[in-house]
C-alpha cells in the first residue's frame, strides 16, 4: 500500500499537485497541516483518493481537526501538525505519550520543515519535511 504523507506546503499548489500526479496509485493522502487551501482544492480535483488532513498553526479558519487517528494497512496512525506537541524544540516526549495512550504504532507530524524518521518504543515517528520551505533545501514528502 502506497500512502502520500506530506506537510507544510504553505500555498505551493503546483508542488502539491505534482505529488499527486507522480503517485497515481496512492491509496490515501495524509496531510499534516499548513496548506489547507491548496489541499482542499486538490481534494476536489482528486476525490477518488481518500484524504485525511489535520490543520496546522497557519491554517486559520480551517475546520479540519488538529489531530486524528487513521487506520490503514493494519496500522494505527496518529496524525498531527506537531505545533501543539512542542516538536520545534526537538522534543517528541509529548507525542510519545499520546501515541502510547492511543495505542498507535505510527506517529506522523510536520511543523519543523525537517524530514525525519525514527523508530523507538516500538513506534515509527515520521516527519515528511516540507513541500515549500524545506530545511534541507529540497522539497520532501
Residue ranges and their predicted role:
Residues 1-49, 59-61, 65-66, 138-141:
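N-terminal active-site segment of His-dependent metallophosphoesterases
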Residues 5-7, 28-34, 52-57, 79-81, ...:
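Active-site neighborhood of phospho(di)ester-bond hydrolases with catalytic His/Asp-centered motifs
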Residues 52-102:
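Helix-adjacent hinge/juxtasegments
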Residues 52, 88-141:
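Conserved beta-sheet core of the metallophosphoesterase superfamily
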Amino acid at each position: 500500500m502506497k500512502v502520500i504523507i506530506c506537510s507544510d506546503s504553505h500555498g505551493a499548489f503546483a508542488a502539491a499537485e505534482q505529488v499527486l500526479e507522480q503517485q497515481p496509485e496512492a491509496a490515501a493522502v495524509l496531510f499534516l497541516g499548513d496548506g489547507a487551501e491548496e489541499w482542499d482544492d486538490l481534494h476536489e480535483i482528486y476525490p477518488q483518493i481518500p484524504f485525511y488532513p489535520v490543520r496546522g498553526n497557519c491554517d486559520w479558519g480551517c475546520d479540519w481537526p488538529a489531530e486524528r487517528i487513521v487506520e490503514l494497512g493494519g496500522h494505527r496512525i496518529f496524525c498531527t501538525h506537531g505545533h501543539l506537541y512542542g516538536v520545534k524544540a526537538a522534543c517528541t516526549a509529548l507525542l510519545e505519550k499520546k501515541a502510547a495512550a492511543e495505542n498507535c504504532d505510527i506517529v506522523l507530524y510536520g511543523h519543523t520543515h525537517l524530514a525525519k524518521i525514527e523508530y523507538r518504543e516500538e513506534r515509527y515517528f515520521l516527519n515528511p519535511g516540507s513541500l515549500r520551505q524545506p530545511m534541507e533545501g529540497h522539497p520532501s514528502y
